[in-house]
């Protein structure tokens, strides 16, 4: 089976003085979360579409779904975790407790605040996860990347045509993800900022799927302005 996990755990600290977490902020007259969710509802492959959100925002999430007449029976709202990867594993535990997990089950995880993903990106994630077990959505790095350990001087300048910028979805064979996460130490888990690194840290390959430049993550006031411009310009019509 195929599952979607929408990560709505952010509290929007980088968005500044706003009354709601960023996933509930208005974008073209409806919350960012609703834009994102609508993309997944259009994909019939999913057995469940699971939204993971902080406990204190679960009721608000359900109220928002009702307000915007989102009634797809596949949608479930659960409590997120203490961080990104803990939230993903909470979704996995929920799937296991309600449906069980088969060897070929996959999960497509996606940031709630990336509302411009496309049908193509979702379908290619599903297919790549079924074929390869783990997949990351990326775009080519446009700018030269430099690394610095002291925040003062350059340590290295990697070859740009080998660099990519990570997006979401990130998709996995569920058993592979569970087994890989269980192999990590508590220290490794504490510094993870990316789900695909769970797989990389256990020396397993992660397939790349090409994203889109406009598949942005809305985390700052500037991002919100860009997102509104994308909608007004009709850039992301897929």
Curated annotation (Swiss-Prot):
The record marks 14, 22 as: Transition state stabilizer. HAMAP family: TarI (MF_02068). The record marks 160, 217 as: Positions ribitol 5-phosphate for the nucleophilic attack. It catalyses: D-ribitol 5-phosphate + CTP + H(+) = CDP-L-ribitol + diphosphate. Keywords: Cell wall biogenesis/degradation, Nucleotidyltransferase, Teichoic acid biosynthesis, Transferase. InterPro entries: IspD/TarI, IspD/TarI_cytidylyltransf_bact, ISPD_synthase_CS, Nucleotide-diphossugar_trans, TarI. CDD domains: CDP-ME_synthetase (cd02516). SUPFAM superfamilies: Nucleotide-diphospho-sugar transferases. Catalyzes the transfer of the cytidylyl group of CTP to D-ribitol 5-phosphate. It comes from the Bacteria. CTP binds at residues 7-10, 81-87. Its EC number is 2.7.7.40. One of its GO terms (molecular function) is 2-C-methyl-D-erythritol 4-phosphate cytidylyltransferase activity. Belongs to the IspD/TarI cytidylyltransferase family. TarI subfamily. The keyword Transferase applies. This is Ribitol-5-phosphate cytidylyltransferase 1. GO terms for biological process: cell wall organization; isoprenoid biosynthetic process; poly(ribitol phosphate) teichoic acid biosynthetic process. Pathway: Cell wall biogenesis; poly(ribitol phosphate) teichoic acid biosynthesis.
